[in-house]
Amino acid sequence: MPHSLRQTLSRQDTFTVRNKMDKNEVISFFDIHSTTWDENMEKDDSKMNEILDVAKISSGNSVLDIACGTGVMIDYYIERNVSKVTGVDISSKMIEIARNKFKKYDFIDFLCEDAEEFNFKYQYDRVMVFNAFPHFPNPKALIKNLAKAVKSGGTVTVAHDRGRKDLDNHHKSVQASKISNGLISENALEEIFKSAGLVDIYKKATEDIYIVSGVKA
C-alpha cells in the first residue's frame, strides 16, 4: 500500500475531538428540542430491527438504553419481550417525556444522569447507544464506563440510522454541529471498544446505517 494512502487511512481511523463540547450546551439543546422530538423522528423499522438483531436483543434480556431521549427505541424492546429497560439521558426534559410515555410498564425505568460518569449499580445483558454517540464529549470514557455496566457475554452497541456523511449534514442543518464531534469511523470506534475490553467486534458503515457492536469478554 502506498505510504500516502496509509497516512490517509490512519487519519480516518483515529479519533480526534472536533469540538470541546460544553455539557450544559448539550443539555440545553436537547431540553429545547424535547417537545418536538417525537414528531420529527422518522423511524425505519427494517433498520431498527437490523440494529437490534446485531445487538442480540431478545426475550428476557435486560437493556441499558444510553441517551434514550424520549424513548425512541423502547417500543422495539417491548416488542422483543425484554425483561428490564433502564433509559438514561442527560436531558431532564427528554427523561420527563419518556417517563410519561412508558409509565404503565413496571419493568421500565429512567435516570437523568451523565452516562460518561454515572456509576451503574446493575449489570445489563445489552447496552445500546442509538443516534447519540457524537454528542458525548469523551467517547472513550463513555465506552469504558458502559463496558463495566454490561455482563460478561453481553453486548455494547453504538448505532445510527444514518451514514457518517449524512449525519454530519443533518447536524449542520439543525444547528447541532457545536454539540457534535461527528461520527467517527467504525475502525476508530473498534479500537475504543477493544481498549475497554470488548471483543468479537461487528462493524457496518454504509451511506445509510452505522453499527459497531462488541461483546464483553
PLM regions and their residue ranges:
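Core SAM-dependent methyltransferase catalytic element
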Residues: 197-198, 205-217
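A short glycine-rich, Lys/Arg-flanked "PGG" loop and its adjoining helix->strand segment in the class I
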Residues: 141-152
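Conserved class I S-adenosyl-L-methionine
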Residues: 5, 9-56, 72, 157-183
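Short alpha-helix
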Residues: 181-196
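Short catalytic micro-motifs in class I SAM-dependent methyltransferases
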Residues: 131-132
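A conserved beta-strand element that flanks and buttresses the S-adenosyl-L-methionine
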Residues: 128
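Class I SAM-dependent methyltransferase SAM/SAH-binding core
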Residues: 64, 70-117
